[in-house]
């Protein structure tokens, strides 16, 4: 496999850490390192978009999430159906808690009519979710705006790339929601953003005040033909993106959505989590 230029640059940067480490014993270096850590502290947490484990039942999904050391999860309706009763939702939420995880959100949830909008918010409220990762049709954004104000639940609009007619890019979503309640913002899917030939670091910084959630992944090409690969093996400049999140003081969840190998995703997911943690340890 050909090494991507940004990965090669990152390798050289990481290699340079040996020099930094050799100086860490001096008082000046220690003070400088302490100041750097204070100025560039990571405020976000890592989580999982359960679409990654769409071929697995709830119990296996919770167990596999724990195996890769993630503590926050957002459920796709495979794991908590949208038509669940309040009693069923309560039972599932308790299972999540018993597994030592936090169910922070749900999605992607489509809202194409009034019934679906009402159901999405009732579902999220019953589950104690803080955010709906959603795709509301443009005509229903005024209704979503009222629901956000009524329920105090955030809606993070998810972009789906160059073939999506509703929200192909983060910028296309902002154009529709810029005058709405700020609790309606973005879930930037960095893979679909890159597939639209947009560097995901750019909208993350430009729309920082409306960034509510992140789906992190890597893709094989900056075009509609790009598909999910293990993080670090694709074309996205992951170190740059993570540095951007630190720079803008992003304080939400960065959820892994590893779409590759649906029947056997654990190895690729673990590799991706390890790569991201390794990068974060250096910034």
Predicted regions and their residues:
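Histidine-acidic metal/acid-base catalytic patches
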Residues: 2-45, 55-68, 125, 170-188, ...
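Residue-level signal for short, function-critical loop segments
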Residues: 52, 161, 260
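Short glycine-rich, flexible loops that bind phosphorylated cofactors or substrates
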Residues: 82, 141, 223
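Flexible loop residues that form catalytic
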Residues: 78, 111, 137, 216-219, ...
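Hydrophobic faces of well-ordered beta-strands that scaffold small-molecule active sites
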Residues: 44-49, 73-75, 103-108, 132-134, ...
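Glycine-rich, proline-tolerant flexible connector loops at the mouths of alpha/beta enzymes
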Residues: 74-91
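Active-site acidic/histidine proton-transfer and metal-coordination neighborhood
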Residues: 16, 20-21, 38, 59-62, ...
